[in-house]
């Protein structure tokens, strides 16, 4: 049985962010360490949440394409598609945070769904399966936002931004910089320099395991980067490599789309 994330109830952004910060605070108390970047997502998953974290070819395990991650609630098992280990650390970390979000925010809905299935006599193996093609559903958006707040905590991002750029937000009016995309002396806020703005913040805050694109969108969400172009911030980034095509494997019993 797979959780239908399109049917997840609405959760306010502030509640999602608070849930992410609460988890970080719990980890800090558990580990006795100050919360700092990079956020040790894998350690939090395994040592604090007690979830088994694995890396495997999910296309073959589940039998459906474009799966980034999956979590089996009853088994306390989380599996990340092994292709993300191939030099995609930012996307890998974000996907781990995304799966953590499903555990923190959504597992109660899956367990409730499981109880209903048990009463009706249906067999089930409760799972949350995250596909690229389903990234726009309400529950998947919530998981993405949680991951962003979790691996890039607002206070830490703000601290790093102020260290580099001062107390005022940067406003983007143009698609292209007047001084060139990679000018080493002048950084003109524009869509094609958003990647460099993000990198400067990442370097200052030691956000070593996040992508530039994810950081740029986090800066925008925090009101530190204001995009007045009417275009998406991602239009200034190089296109990510497409999800690799793999042969379709055998379906995992009791897991359906």
Each PLM stretch: what is its role?
Residues 1-257:
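Active-site hotspot residues in diverse enzymes, especially metal/ion-binding acidic/histidine motifs
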